């Protein structure tokens, strides 16, 4: 019986309970999902904040850099030449534009400023252009004008309107001096050198030791090309300066027009002296003046 | 159904986080490059 009864003992493994338990463990509860969602949302928020902060910092830094580059560009333009082309917006990283959302700095304002400045510079240069005419020896074929400054030749070209070449010089007295001159023989009179000066020297005239005899005689043109600037600049020279009307110079092509002026002056003085000494009235007056002076001196000494 | 919705939302936010992390990395890279340039 016991054996039979023992055979009635429930020997089932009750596996269904286990299966149920396992199924519950595989599917996370809704609360866990909600927690996970909250966690990722918080992370998302934190990332967004960090990104915003980083973008702000980046924008500030970028703005500083742009300002610095603009400033250096402007100083470069002031000193030398037209600016380099601005970096094309296409070259800007699309990401930085999109993410940073920074308004790309408009280059139109800078360009306008630059154009205005350039125009002003051009007008200043135009104002200071002066033309000076120098008389040279007919045999002299060089394009060298001795005006007291040192010049460095940087070019020469043949122009259509004039058969003689035009030489370009830059002032070599000071590195910062931007004065340039063009020298070309006059079409009307090949013995006249036409020097066109652009700008104004920012330094005093170099030593005039060698300049006393070596300077060309300059002729200021009677027309409108000659400016007071040129006249003032030349008047500072210690050499005899003659102002000759070009209309006259056209007519006078004889060798007398090429006489050296110091010689003429010397001749005039000699002529005046000889004519005075030959005049008996003058010698008598001179003798009277001298004796009178001597008499006066003797009288006061006594 | 609610769990599915939650799971979808988690996936979406995770994907967004991944993108944000990538963007942040790039901005950081640019920032430090610019910073080095300035220095």
From Swiss-Prot, chain A:
Keywords: DNA-binding, Nucleus, Transcription, Transcription regulation. Gene3D superfamilies: WRKY domain (2.20.25.80). The keyword Transcription regulation applies. Residues 140-206 bind DNA. SUPFAM superfamilies: WRKY DNA-binding domain (SSF118290). PROSITE patterns: WRKY. PANTHER family: WRKY TRANSCRIPTION FACTOR 36-RELATED (PTHR31429), WRKY TRANSCRIPTION FACTOR 40-RELATED (PTHR31429:SF3). Transcription factor. Interacts specifically with the W box (5'-(T)TGAC[CT]-3'), a frequently occurring elicitor-responsive cis-acting element. Belongs to the WRKY group III family. This is Probable WRKY transcription factor 40. It comes from Arabidopsis thaliana. The lineage of its organism: Eukaryota, Viridiplantae, Streptophyta, Embryophyta, Tracheophyta.
